Amino acid sequence: MIQISNQDFEAAFRYFEEAVASHKRSLGPFQDFRTGLAEEWESYKVWLHHEARGRLKAGDWKPGWAGSGKILDHVLAAIRIKEDKERRNNIVEWEPKRGDKSTSIVRLLEARKQPSLRQEAENLLFRLFREAGDPEPVFNELTEAFGRRYDLISYLFFLRDWHQFMPVRSSIFPNAFEKLGVPHQMSMRCGWENYQGFLERLHEVRRHLERVVPDRIRLIDAHSFCW
C-alpha cells in the first residue's frame, strides 16, 4: 500500500502554496482548486474532458460501426482539439510537428486507412467506451494495437471515466512523486501495473489534500497538484 508521510506532503504543499502566492498573476494565497490561480492553471483539463466527451459521443456508437471508420473518426476528433492557445489538448502528442510518424496517434491514423487494422482498432475502442468489463485486458490490448504511448492510452482511459482514471505525462509525474517520497519511474514503462501505481499515488495525494483544503477534492485536483 502506497503511503505518503505527513511530513513529505506538508513540505510539498508549502511549496505549492508559495508557487501560487508568489506568481505574478496570483490573486492571493491558495484557497482551493476552483478559484484563483490554481483554477486558471488547471481548469483547461476539466474543459478538455467535457469537450472531448462531447466529440466522442460514445453513447451513440453501434456495434455495427466497428470496421466502418466512424469510431476512429470520433476518437481522433476527441484527441485533435485546438480551439486556441489555452483551450487545446496538450496531454497527447498529436500535432505532426515532425510528420505523422512522430505523433502518438500514428497507429490510429494507420488503422483509419487500412481495413485490416480498422476492424480490430474499432472493436477495441468500442469495448473501452461501451462495455463495463475488466479494464486491464483492454489496456493491454490497446498498447499492443496503438503502441506503448502512455499519453494516448491514459488519455483514452481518462475519457472513459475521470473519476477512476487520469492522463499521464511520464516526464512530469515521477518528479512530483519523488518529492512526495513515493518514487515511481514511468518513462518507457507504459503498462497496466505501472499505471495502477500512478493512480494509487494520486489517490494518496487526494487523501492528503482532503485534510488541508476545505473544498471537495476530486482526483483531477490531485492530478493538478502533482502537475
Which residues does each PLM region occupy?
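Contiguous, well-ordered alpha-helical segments that form the cores/surfaces of helical PPI scaffolds
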Residues: 153-161
